[in-house]
């Protein structure tokens, strides 16, 4: 189980799949996403179900990006990784919450 941002960064590689469990846009909850690119700035993902050609073509075909931000703006509970706008960590400041699938 992922317990901190460093572990998450090491775990996410191209091909890793994520299930969105919370999002600032309610329509994104339940999406299945696949990591396409990871760097020191953030992680790029494409939407798998149903594919969204507009979003998946963004950033030179890498999909949408979620910036890493500060470790203090993340929480890790019960296998769910959550990124927030700031350290407040409320439903109003949630950017995205997700579960890494087929986690070892």
Each PLM stretch: what is its role?
Residues 45-47:
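SH3/SH3-like beta-barrel fold
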Residues 50-104:
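Intrinsically disordered, low-complexity, charged/polar segments
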């Amino acid at each position: 189980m992922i317990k901190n941002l460093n572990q998450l960064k090491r775990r996410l590689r191209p091909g890793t799949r994520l299930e969105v469990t919370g999002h600032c846009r309610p329509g994104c909850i339940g999406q299945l996403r696949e990591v396409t690119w990871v760097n020191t700035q953030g992680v790029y993902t494409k939407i798998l179900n149903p594919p969204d050609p507009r979003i998946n073509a963004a950033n030179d075909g890498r999909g949408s990006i979620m910036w890493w931000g500060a470790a203090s703006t993340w929480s890790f509970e019960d296998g769910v990784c959550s990124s927030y706008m700031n350290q407040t960590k409320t439903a109003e400041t949630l950017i995205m919450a997700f579960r890494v699938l087929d986690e070892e």
